[in-house]
A protein has these predicted regions:
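A conserved mid-domain beta-alpha-beta active-site/ligand-binding segment of alpha/beta enzyme cores
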Residues: 22
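A short, structured beta-strand-centered segment in the mid-to-C-terminal lobe
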Residues: 26-37
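Domain-scale activation on soluble regions of proteins
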Residues: 57-65
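Short, contiguous alpha-helical
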Residues: 1-18, 44-51, 64-127
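Alpha-helical segment that forms one wall of the substrate-binding/catalytic cleft
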Residues: 39-42
Length: 127
């Protein structure tokens, strides 16, 4: 809650159910300096956790209780565009979850980035 206020974020979930205009609105309202500080803190804490994982931990799947906790705490919403993440995460082991962001996750967003870039270019030509 403290970080949410510091960043001036209006959401606590992953943002998967946001529309393009909601993403733009969120981007405008966020305090980018605080967002960078948050990212750095998350990175440090993640490194601490990962450093202490054992080989057996890497094979462990996320439990239904943990998935329910994510929903309860607002990490995902009950919207279909957000809720599917719980099913996805529930099918992965810890190793798969750790590999997803630096590998597949970035690729998922490339199409959106290209589409936004083209929209911005088209808009600039009209001005």
């Amino acid at each position: 809650q403290e970080w949410k206020e510091r960043m001036r974020a209006s959401i606590t979930d992953t943002g998967n159910a946001l529309t393009d205009s909601e993403i733009i609105g969120l981007s405008r309202e966020l305090d980018m300096e605080e967002l960078l500080q948050y990212r750095n803190c998350v990175g440090r804490r993640t490194r601490e956790i990962v450093t202490n994982l054992t080989p057996d931990d890497m094979k462990r799947r996320v439990s239904p209780v943990q998935l329910e906790q994510i929903l309860k705490e607002g990490g995902v919403t009950k919207q279909e565009e957000s809720l599917w993440l719980l099913d996805y995460w529930g099918q992965k082991d810890v190793a798969g979850l750790l590999l997803m962001p630096p590998t597949r996750h970035v690729i998922l967003h490339l199409n959106d980035c290209c589409r936004w870039k083209e929209w911005i270019r088209t808009r600039k030509r009209k001005i």
